[in-house]
């Protein structure tokens, strides 16, 4: 079991390091892999608050979705453009977040939220990577 956890941790570290260099690249073939499932979700952005629901200070690279707290969210545009990998460590009070049909991405300020919404047009494809627990 310990080996599986170590391998999983290595995979997560690799994904996070790749996300910094691969942002904006297109991978439409990723949607063709039958072993990987994606959810098409509404996507919003927020820039308020200081501490997440899990006690983590807010920072770019986190997102909120009540059903997936503790998981990683790999976000793509519908054309396969890679947006990044986000740690889901926050929740929200909106019905969409509670039902898990929205992913809310933290941005450092209002201008970054507006940029995010223009980029995504309010829709993303999400691959969830289960976290521990």
Predicted regions and their residues:
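Solvent-exposed, well-ordered loop and adjacent helix/strand elements within mature globular domains
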Residues: 23-133
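Generic short amphipathic/hydrophobic targeting helices enriched at N-termini
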Residues: 6-9, 32
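Sec/Tat signal peptide C-region and signal peptidase I cleavage site
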Residues: 18-21
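Positively charged n-region of N-terminal signal peptides that target proteins for export
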Residues: 1-4
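Bacterial N-terminal signal peptides
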Residues: 8-16
């Amino acid at each position: 079991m310990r080996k599986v956890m170590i391998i999983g941790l290595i995979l997560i570290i690799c994904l996070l390091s790749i996300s910094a260099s691969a942002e904006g690249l297109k991978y439409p073939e990723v949607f063709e892999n039958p072993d990987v499932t994606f959810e098409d979700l509404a996507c919003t952005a927020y820039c308020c608050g200081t501490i997440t629901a899990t006690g983590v200070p807010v920072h770019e690279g986190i997102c909120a979705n009540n059903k997936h707290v503790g998981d990683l969210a790999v976000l793509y545009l519908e054309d396969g453009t890679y947006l990044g990998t986000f740690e889901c460590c926050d929740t929200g009070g909106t019905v969409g977040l509670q039902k898990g049909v929205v992913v809310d991405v933290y941005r450092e300020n209002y201008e970054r939220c507006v940029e995010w919404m223009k980029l995504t047009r309010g829709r993303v494809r999400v691959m969830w990577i289960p976290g521990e627990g």
